[in-house]
């Protein structure tokens, strides 16, 4: 009951600041929360999804697609032991949330995974444009580099990007995190 009251206060305060929360978004948000298992509780899910959805709207206008992606990012990142907000920042820098993005080096999808990883792990049939597959690969790779770097985010991000020893890439991810996802 208290959680519902707090959510309504949050929604009403959003309306007071001119950011109208429409009925369709509220309905989609409820459905997404019901299907998500990576949150501690329903209230945490409601607040996190609503906050991040507002920021993600500039990249993904469709509310259903946006909330579905946020749920997938939260699930994959928490399963890998990563903060979802850092994964959001990395995706913003890597692909601007374009699941079909392909870099000049051939990296694919949201988290820009190099296709050689499919062969390396014996799964050549995997589709890196598939959101859940791409997130699973990306979060696992990032967590590996974070462990290898003794939880030094700058080093882990540079390794992830293939720019170890340089810090322009970690700065870009950290800036995106501070500006949009923190």
Describe the residue ranges of each PLM region.
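Catalytic glycan-binding domains that act on GlcNAc-containing polysaccharides
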Residues: 20-182
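Sec-dependent N-terminal signal peptides
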Residues: 4-13
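Boundary at the C-terminal end of the N-terminal hydrophobic targeting segment
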Residues: 16-18
